[in-house]
UniProtKB/Swiss-Prot annotation:
One of the primary rRNA binding proteins, it binds directly to 16S rRNA where it nucleates assembly of the body of the 30S subunit. One of its GO terms (biological process) is ribosomal small subunit biogenesis. This is Small ribosomal subunit protein uS4c. Keywords: Chloroplast, Plastid, Ribonucleoprotein, Ribosomal protein, RNA-binding, rRNA-binding. It comes from the Eukaryota. Coiled coil: none annotated. The lineage of its organism: Eukaryota, Viridiplantae, Streptophyta, Embryophyta, Tracheophyta. GO terms for molecular function: rRNA binding; structural constituent of ribosome. Part of the 30S ribosomal subunit. Contacts protein S5. The interaction surface between S4 and S5 is involved in control of translational fidelity. Pfam families: Ribosomal_S4, S4. SUPFAM superfamilies: Alpha-L RNA-binding motif. Residues 89-157 form the S4 RNA-binding domain. It is found in: Plastid, Chloroplast.
Length: 201
């Protein structure tokens, strides 16, 4: 299944706020949960909804998300928590959380077009897994810096998660540590996502 490129407002009306996909927010009363019926179908739809929220927020294909679930399942810690950490430490998401891009698709474009450096080296893979002490910067040219300048200047430092640090003068971000669960940028029940996939096998 390919990455979603359709109307974004349609998705947030069904699934709720997806800050990684769009800055728009759904109107109250538009959530899919109100359409549910009782029984097993309701439980399946709830699990499906949480899975879809995760997929669309982080801009993943079904195959990509399934691969992350498999990797998380091999860890000795909570599968759901490891899954969220894997997704949050992707380079495209780190750029989004740092305020260097307004959405994750926007961050992915920056990476694909070779505007972003990690520890001084160009990285053009959006799924690149960042780690503690990684330094994220733009290329040292006017065009690359211009793409993030306005966004970084208008970003709210108070909303920056504690595992990240930003230097708006140097157009530079620092990964301090692996994030804690409470700093995940999406309202999600990751256990339902894990349960969804466990019932597919």
């Amino acid at each position: 299944m390919s990455r979603y490129r359709g109307p974004r407002l349609k998705k947030i009306r069904r699934l709720g706020a997806l800050p990684g996909l769009t800055r728009k927010t759904p109107k109250s009363g538009s959530n899919l949960k109100k359409k549910f019926h009782s029984g097993k179908k309701e439980q399946y739809r709830i699990r499906l909804q949480e899975k879809q929220k995760l997929r669309f927020h982080y801009g993943l294909t079904e195959r990509q998300l399934l691969r992350y679930v498999h990797i998380a399942g091999k860890a000795k810690r909570s599968t759901g928590q490891v899954l969220l950490q894997l997704l949050e430490m992707r380079l495209d998401n780190i750029l989004f959380r740092l305020g260097m891009a307004s959405t994750i698709p926007g961050a992915r474009q920056l990476v694909n077009h070779r505007h972003i450096l990690v520890n001084g080296r160009i990285v053009n893979i959006p799924s690149f897994r960042c780690k503690p002490r990684d330094i994220i910067t733009t290329k040292d040219n006017q065009r690359s810096k211009g793409l993030v300048q306005t966004l970084m200047a208008s970003s709210d430092p108070g909303k920056l998660p504690k595992h990240l640090t930003i230097d708006t003068l140097e157009y530079k971000g620092l990964v301090n540590k692996i994030l804690d669960r409470k700093w995940v940028g999406l309202k999600i029940n990751e256990l339902l996502v894990v349960e969804y996939y466990s019932r597919q096998t």
